[in-house]
Amino acid sequence: MIKEAILKVVNGNDLNAKEAYGAMDEIMSGESSEVQMSAYLTALSMKGETIEEITASTKAMRAHCVKLLNDEEVLEIVGTGGDGSNTFNISTTSSIVISAAGVPVAKHGNRSASSKCGAADVLEALGVNIYIEPEKSLKILKEINLCFLFAQNYHLAMKFVAGVRKELSIRTIFNILGPLTNPAGATMQVLGVYDESLVKPLCEVLKNVGVKSALSVYGQDGLDEISVSDKTSVCELRDGRLKCYEIAPEDFGMERCSKEDLVGGNPRENAEITLSILNGQKGPKRNAVVLNSAAALYVAGKADSIEDGVRLASEIIDSGRAKKQLEKFIEYTNS
């Protein structure tokens, strides 16, 4: 299947769903050679991945991952990475705030790929045990509305392509697939993307793979988050329909900051930033967490609008509930 797919893509032709699924299935099964994987991923990247190809590839990758057998609706807040901005861990910090509001959050992430500090790195620096079994993660999710799904524990088939990705050192479809393949089958999602051209297509993919409510976002300053230093392009999925619009920090009573105000550092430094926000420190970094948390609270139906979500997220931080949630998370993962 992958040989035929390579030939088709090299000639600039799009794959149908069956062809794209088959090619990814071969890769995830370890049946493709490194040369075949390199050719396929490079050609696909040069042609440009279609919605149909991304949807089918997502389904194939999901079929090969270890699943968290969860029967409740959960939310994911995640960025594709690759924006080169080296911000602190906005979505990871936000996941603590969101879950403290009573929204079940299955945060899916990995160690750093394109920045100094990934979700796994900062959580580990905060004292969270990231190496726990799926059964225990599910138990913790049910008890405190929060769990962390360390990608390498769930996407075991990625070992077949890891070497190729490292050697290629170019953006491939896998940069997009990670955030689309939550092992808990998240049905609510805030997805940050690294390129404005992906905002609507990836929202369409989320719809195709069963997500019910979502925001796909791109900060126009280049962030794969909702930005507080520029406008943000948004595509919203609600009731099976897509709606695209822009939002700005001023819409929510926030001052624009400079992009540099959101820069983080190594895991220890980013852990300190997260703690300072949860301890109530004001400023641009807190605003970024509040606004991204607000969007997720809106997606989850805990707030009637992003504006209402801003009020709720602020109250959760100021009341100390978010800090207590982190303390519980550390305790539960280490007990």
Curated annotation (Swiss-Prot):
**Which pathway does the record list?**
Amino-acid biosynthesis; L-tryptophan biosynthesis; L-tryptophan from chorismate: step 2/5
Alphabetized UniProt keyword annotations: Amino-acid biosynthesis, Aromatic amino acid biosynthesis, Glycosyltransferase, Magnesium, Metal-binding, Transferase, Tryptophan biosynthesis
Enzyme class of the recorded protein, top EC level: transferase
Q: How is the cofactor bound?
A: Binds 2 magnesium ions per monomer.
Q: Which of this chain's residues are annotated to bind 5-phospho-alpha-D-ribose 1-diphosphate?
A: 79, 82-83, 87, 89-92, 107-115, 119
Coiled coil: present as a keyword of the record?
no
Which catalysed reactions does the entry list for this protein? N-(5-phospho-beta-D-ribosyl)anthranilate + diphosphate = 5-phospho-alpha-D-ribose 1-diphosphate + anthranilate
Residues binding Mg(2+) 1: 91, 225
Q: What EC numbers are recorded for this enzyme?
A: 2.4.2.18
Output the InterPro entries linked to this UniProt entry. Answer: Anthranilate_Pribosyl_Tfrase (IPR005940), Glycosyl_Trfase_fam3 (IPR000312), Glycosyl_Trfase_fam3_N_dom (IPR017459), Glycosyl_Trfase_fam3_N_dom_sf (IPR036320), Nuc_phospho_transferase (IPR035902)
Which residues are listed for Mg(2+) 2 binding in this entry?
224-225
GO MF term set: anthranilate phosphoribosyltransferase activity; magnesium ion binding
GO process terms (BP): L-tryptophan biosynthetic process
Task: Provide the cofactor list for this protein.
Answer: Mg(2+)
Residues engaged in binding anthranilate 2: 165
Family of the protein in this entry: Belongs to the anthranilate phosphoribosyltransferase family.
Q: How does it assemble?
A: Homodimer.
What this protein is reported to do is described as:
Catalyzes the transfer of the phosphoribosyl group of 5-phosphorylribose-1-pyrophosphate (PRPP) to anthranilate to yield N-(5'-phosphoribosyl)-anthranilate (PRA).
Protein name per the record: Anthranilate phosphoribosyltransferase
- Write down the species: Methanobrevibacter smithii (strain ATCC 35061 / DSM 861 / OCM 144 / PS)
Per the record, the gene is trpD
